[in-house]
């Protein structure tokens, strides 16, 4: 009998780096062996303009929403929209803050990012996060020489969550989708500074994740082609040929967590440690 993993979308919204949420989400999801989260991490969400596209992304791929947003107006907007969409939302810090307020008899300051010491390491992480969010999914290709790492790979190989995980450690990371038959940005072939690495997975793994991805999508997918195993095999073959041609290392993420994938990337470039 085929042992299929059930996937679900886990949306993590933070007004800071998102480390608290990532840890909480993974600690909870580890208790459910039959289901694996597809993480969508949204750090540095501090105003309505930044939040609205996040809410649209949740609507496109419904799942569990965890957030650490101290601004009451933004937190209320998240809860209201999640109720409308019929998805669960949890303000992870609110019960803890309430307990502190009751015990200490004093209100919290509700200051964004108050848990972080304002040292050089913190500002390096924020700079890396801003860079990584600006260079997600092939955006701003002319800046790749400013990156520490450029991750490439076909759709659903964990490029974005791995990029954000690295950024939370101060590593500026860009990621680019490999689309069969579509040339990669010319700047990728002329850049000299960053480590370029390709993420791959088995055909079955990618097909499963893609099938789950389109469950909540209402448009924008050629569903049959997107999950077709023969088509995915061709995409992987194309990615492997690109990497062989340019001597870019491959990392198979099939049985790796995001942390393990990030560690494998760092191991390829010791100065990133």
UniProtKB/Swiss-Prot annotation:
Name the EC number(s). 2.7.11.32, 2.7.4.27
Top EC class, one word: transferase
Can you tell me which residues bind ADP?
A: 153-160
Tell me which UniProt keywords the record has, alphabetically. Kinase, Nucleotide-binding, Serine/threonine-protein kinase, Transferase
Instruction: Name the chemical reaction catalysed here.
Output: N(tele)-phospho-L-histidyl/L-threonyl-[pyruvate, phosphate dikinase] + ADP = N(tele)-phospho-L-histidyl/O-phospho-L-threonyl-[pyruvate, phosphate dikinase] + AMP + H(+); N(tele)-phospho-L-histidyl/O-phospho-L-threonyl-[pyruvate, phosphate dikinase] + phosphate + H(+) = N(tele)-phospho-L-histidyl/L-threonyl-[pyruvate, phosphate dikinase] + diphosphate
Please verify whether the record's keywords include Nucleotide-binding.
yes
- One Pfam match: Kinase-PPPase
The record ties this protein, via HAMAP family, to:
PDRP
Q: Which family does the entry's similarity section mention?
A: Belongs to the pyruvate, phosphate/water dikinase regulatory protein family. PDRP subfamily.
Q: What is this protein called?
A: Putative pyruvate, phosphate dikinase regulatory protein
């Amino acid at each position: 009998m085929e042992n299929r993993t059930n996937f679900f979308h886990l949306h993590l919204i933070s007004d800071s780096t998102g480390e608290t949420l990532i840890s909480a989400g993974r600690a909870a999801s580890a208790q459910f062996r039959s289901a694996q989260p597809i993480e969508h991490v949204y750090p540095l969400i501090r105003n309505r303009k930044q939040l609205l596209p996040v809410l649209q992304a949740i609507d496109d791929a419904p799942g569990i929403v965890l957030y650490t947003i101290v601004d009451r107006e933004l937190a209320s907007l998240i809860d209201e929209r999640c109720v409308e969409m019929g998805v669960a939302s949890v303000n992870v810090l609110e019960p803890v803050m309430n307990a502190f307020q009751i015990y200490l008899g004093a209100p919290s300051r509700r200051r964004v990012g108050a848990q972080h010491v304002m040292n050089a390491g913190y500002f390096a992480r924020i700079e890396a996060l801003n860079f990584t969010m600006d260079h997600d999914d092939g955006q701003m290709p002319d800046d790749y020489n400013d990156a520490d790492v450029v991750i490439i790979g076909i759709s659903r190989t964990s490029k974005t969550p791995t990029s954000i995980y690295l950024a939370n450690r101060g590593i500026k990371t860009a990621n680019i989708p490999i689309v069969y038959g579509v040339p990669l940005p010319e700047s990728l072939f002329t850049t000299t500074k960053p480590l370029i690495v390709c993420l791959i997975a088995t055909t079955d793994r990618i097909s499963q994740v893609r099938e789950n991805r389109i469950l909540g999508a209402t448009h924008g997918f050629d569903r049959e082609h997107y999950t077709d195993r023969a088509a995915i095999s061709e995409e992987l073959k194309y990615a492997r040929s690109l990497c062989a041609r340019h001597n870019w290392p491959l990392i198979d993420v099939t049985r790796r967590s995001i942390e393990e994938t990030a560690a494998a990337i760092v191991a390829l470039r010791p100065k990133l440690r």
